């Protein structure tokens, strides 16, 4: 969210920020996202509430499941079925409502957990669908899905963010942070973030438990 927002702002876009409260365990991110939206003075910031707690196969929505702390082969339990498709569809609907032609998303397919909806081919396919399934698209106004971080590793993403003055102390990546937003330092997301700062050789401002 933060790195992509900073990048879009620096590229001259008028930014509208969308966040989804889907009853995820890591809802602390909503607090940080609001602060970032205010910091970057977005035109409008929306939070859409969707209860996905009934998607019981994901440890991000099923609180009776443990968040895995050891990387595993295959797609981990933190995968939420079709999450990015739902989020992108809401973003697409809002973009068409406000006559916006560019949608930015911060997915990454290098240092990631193996989610199928974070891959470059998924982004291309969604963009094709967006231009087939919307009034804006069929009338000839191309809708672009921008995923500028898709081919970057975590260290490269952090470096890019720092070059655009991103304050990473205002962000949280953890799948199971405390109510105060302190990261667990055990989950896959914490590991990837921590290793990114280590590889870059800069101090990690994350508050860990």
Protein language model features and the residues they cover:
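Iron-sulfur (Fe-S) cluster-binding segments and ferredoxin-like electron-carrier domains
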Residues: 180-183, 188-209
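ATP-dependent adenylation/nucleotidyltransferase module used to activate substrates
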Residues: 1-164
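Immediate flanking context of iron-sulfur cluster ligation sites
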Residues: 164-185
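Alpha-helix termini
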Residues: 25, 34-36, 178, 198-201
């Amino acid at each position: 969210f933060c790195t992509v927002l900073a990048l879009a702002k620096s590229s001259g876009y008028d930014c509208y920020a969308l966040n989804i409260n889907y009853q995820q365990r890591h809802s602390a991110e909503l607090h940080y996202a609001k602060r970032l939206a205010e910091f970057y003075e977005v035109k409008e910031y929306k939070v859409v509430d969707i209860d996905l707690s009934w998607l019981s196969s994901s440890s991000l929505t099923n609180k009776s499941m443990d968040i895995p702390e050891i990387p595993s082969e295959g797609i981990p339990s933190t995968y939420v079925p079709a999450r990015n498709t739902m989020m992108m569809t809401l973003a697409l609907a809002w973009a068409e409502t406000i006559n916006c032609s560019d949608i930015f998303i911060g997915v990454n397919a290098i240092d990631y957990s193996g989610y199928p909806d974070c891959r470059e081919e998924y982004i291309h396919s969604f963009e094709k669908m967006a231009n087939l399934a919307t009034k804006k698209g069929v009338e000839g106004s191309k809708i672009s899905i921008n995923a500028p971080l898709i081919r970057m590793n975590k260290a490269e993403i952090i470096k890019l963010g720092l070059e655009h003055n991103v304050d990473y102390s205002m962000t949280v990546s953890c799948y199971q942070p405390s109510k105060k937003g302190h990261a667990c330092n055990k989950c896959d997301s914490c590991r990837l973030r921590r290793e990114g700062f280590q590889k870059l050789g800069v101090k990690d401002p994350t508050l860990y438990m």
